[in-house]
């Protein structure tokens, strides 16, 4: 299965590496070119015991890119694991999630499964489903 994980923080990076270790073709997508360069070199920008070793063992199934079109075009499943920081009023900032959805829609000619792993408030997945339904 071709899996893209949008966001290579603690949630996204670990997920992408584990998917690759299980034999799936996994792409880790991030807007941070420096982080992508580090990951392509086999180094992790965060501390997670055993992660770099698992990255090395899974390197034949694991790729990192900042090019969202490339990352999304052949994905069977896309995991969105981007930040949802708290706004001043305490609500979640969902612009990164919605930006990922915009890029997915722009890059896809056929459907795929989109899984939101980011922490989002109730109703967000309904909003995302309606968004994709409207553009289909």
Spell out what each predicted region is.
Residues 2, 25, 31-77, 83-91, ...:
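Conserved N-terminal Rossmann-fold NAD(P) cofactor-binding segment
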Residues 8-9:
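Glycine-rich Rossmann-fold phosphate-binding loop(s) that bind the pyrophosphate
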Residues 12-13:
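N-terminal Rossmann-fold NAD(P) dinucleotide-binding loop
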Residues 16, 20-21:
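Gly/Ala-rich phosphate-binding loop of Rossmann-like dinucleotide-binding domains
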Residues 86-136:
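Rossmann-like NAD(P)(H) cofactor-binding subdomain of soluble oxidoreductases
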């Amino acid at each position: 299965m071709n899996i893209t994980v949008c966001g290579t923080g603690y949630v996204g990076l670990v997920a992408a590496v584990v998917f690759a270790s299980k034999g799936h073709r996994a792409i880790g997508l991030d807007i941070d070119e420096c982080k992508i360069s580090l990951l392509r070199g086999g180094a992790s920008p965060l501390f997670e015991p055993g992660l770099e070793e698992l990255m090395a063992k899974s390197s034949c199934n694991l790729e990192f890119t900042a090019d969202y079109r490339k990352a999304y075009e052949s994905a069977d499943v896309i995991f969105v694991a981007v930040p949802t920081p708290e706004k001043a009023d305490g609500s979640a900032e969902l612009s990164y999630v919605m930006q990922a959805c915009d890029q997915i829609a722009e890059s896809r000619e056929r459907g795929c499964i989109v899984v939101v792993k980011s922490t989002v408030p109730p109703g967000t997945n309904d909003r995302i489903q309606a968004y994709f339904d409207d553009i289909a």
